[in-house]
């Protein structure tokens, strides 16, 4: 099956059902990282993933990794850590710093080049991309970022510079997200880290069905205002 070359004159994408089985989910190439194209992609269950300096590749894997926030797994050791958690948490206080940290701290190398950082920072200024920050005193030690699509959150990347920083960021975010009506977190591709936190794989067509409904259920504006996140209430 041939891969679709995206047109510079249109933001249209081929159906995710046309994605390759190997490599799993590769659907299209080319285009750009402009806000209209990125939003069109996420609204169709498609995301960019490519190496810096290479052509943009667009993916929609089958199966799809997701996390239902109510199924978030908190281990016994994590619960012990959280009882005396030294961190404070914020939302949308340092998006640029979070995505830069995600770009520099990924063990397997990074796909988050300068062009990707600029594109997602632009989405952040438009109110579509969001970050969670973890602070130890005044130092940023962990966080995550992603894209909101209605009551679905497309998680892109997380980082940790201190013990359990990224895990605690996700736990606090899940509480905040569900409290405002959020229903599903897209993890894209399952890995050992997300699986340990409760992420599972579901068929792509089921994910797309859920996406088609959730994207038309926006969360209240106050969900995404820059704010401190209440850690203690998240653990009740």
UniProtKB/Swiss-Prot annotation:
The keyword Cell inner membrane does not apply. Keywords: Acyltransferase, Cytoplasm, Transferase. Gene3D superfamilies: Leucyl/phenylalanyl-tRNA-protein transferase, C-terminal domain, Leucyl/phenylalanyl-tRNA-protein transferase, N-terminal domain. It catalyses: N-terminal L-lysyl-[protein] + L-leucyl-tRNA(Leu) = N-terminal L-leucyl-L-lysyl-[protein] + tRNA(Leu) + H(+); N-terminal L-arginyl-[protein] + L-leucyl-tRNA(Leu) = N-terminal L-leucyl-L-arginyl-[protein] + tRNA(Leu) + H(+); L-phenylalanyl-tRNA(Phe) + an N-terminal L-alpha-aminoacyl-[protein] = an N-terminal L-phenylalanyl-L-alpha-aminoacyl-[protein] + tRNA(Phe). It is an enzyme of class 2 (transferase). Its main location: cytoplasm. One of its GO terms (cellular component) is cytoplasm. Its EC number is 2.3.2.6. The keyword Cytoplasm applies. GO terms for biological process: protein catabolic process. Pfam families: Leu_Phe_trans (PF03588). Disulfide bonds: none annotated. One of its GO terms (molecular function) is leucyl-tRNA--protein transferase activity. It is found in: Cytoplasm. HAMAP family: Leu_Phe_trans. Belongs to the L/F-transferase family. Functions in the N-end rule pathway of protein degradation where it conjugates Leu, Phe and, less efficiently, Met from aminoacyl-tRNAs to the N-termini of proteins containing an N-terminal arginine or lysine. This is Leucyl/phenylalanyl-tRNA--protein transferase. The lineage of its organism: Bacteria, Pseudomonadati, Pseudomonadota, Gammaproteobacteria, Enterobacterales. The gene is aat.
